[in-house]
Structures are given as structure tokens and as C-alpha cells.
Amino acid sequence: IVYTSTTPELIECVNEEIRKNLGDTPEILNYQDPSILAEVREHGYVTAGAAARLVGMYMQAVSDGADVILNCCSSVGEVADAAQNIGRYTGIPIVRIDEEMCREAVRLGKRVGVLATLPTTLEPTKNTVSRVAREMNSHVELVDGLVDAFGADQNKFKALLCAKAEEIADQVDVILLAQGSMAYAEDAIHEKIGKPVLSSPRFGAQALAKALQEKGM
């Protein structure tokens, strides 16, 4: 599992979802480099250096004997897209944590709200929703939900997300949470607005399981 910035809560959430789908059998290796997201936030885009370090983590995972790689940071998800040929060549799939979540959002409605606390996550997530919508021969309207809550404690974070969701609720059919670290607010937001709310860890774990099944594992 490749993280560019993380918290113990996110690791616990992702591991829990993986075990729900795969049981306790898999050995989970965590690779972390917080400097990647810090550099992306500082520049406002994925720099060449940040992309190189991320791909370096993919290659380290391959060298360490990984059977599949889960990319957990949506801010650098497009690097994972660019690395798909590496996955095919090495036989080690590189799975984005958020892609199947984006597909489910397109299935659920034409108006998709995207909640994020970082502009560098908001735009790549919107790009992914637009791409998968084209692939599904669908069209979506995207509604921004940028919240200034990065670094807030859990209660404050949840309250700010709920307030933003309520603000855009009439404009959307479904809301997706652009960052995996937002997953713990999913139920609270759903209760507040009464519309589908999607977070990436469970979809990423399902995609991981599917990738392993396709390898015959």
C-alpha cells in the first residue's frame, strides 16, 4: 500500500477494508513518503520530483515481492494512471484507491459533488470522474465542495464537511469524498443530507481484491 501522507486512522481504515475483502491472510506492506504530498501542496501540482519518488515506491514494492499495489493518494492518482504500463510489464497491478468510487458516483447520478480539503486533490478527482464518465458513455455535472479543514481535529473536520455537504446538497445526486482520510465522516454526511455519500477505502479494497482474483490469487 503506497501512501504519500497518512494518519494512523487512515492506515487502520484501509487495512480494515482490505481484511473485509481478503481476510487476514494477506501480508500488508506500507510505503510512506509524506514529502510527496507536501511538495504537491507547495507547488499546486505534481512536480517531476514528486512523481519520480512515487514511481520509486511502486518499484520498491515490486522488488519487495508485492502481488498488487494500492495507491492511496488521490492527489497523485494520475501518476498511478501513467504507471499502468509498468504494472502490466511487471505483472504487478497498480490500483487507484479512488477509481471505482468515481465509477460508482457516475452510476448513481448525473450531478456529482466532490468534497475535498486540498485543491490538489479536488482537481485530480474531478478529472477522474470526468474520465470514467466518458468511458461509461455518460455525462456528469461536477460541483466543487472545497473545505478549509486540512489539519482540523476529527470533530471539527466532520462538522465542516457536513456543513459544506448541506450547502451543495440541492445541486447534487451523490457526493464523493476525494481523500481517503475523510472516510470516517461518510455516515455523518449521509445522515445530514440523505443522499449517497462515497468514500474511497472500501472501493479501493474491492478493486484490490478484484485485481488479485484476475491474477488467479
Identify the meaning behind each predicted range.
Residues 1-217:
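Non-catalytic structural scaffold of enzyme domains
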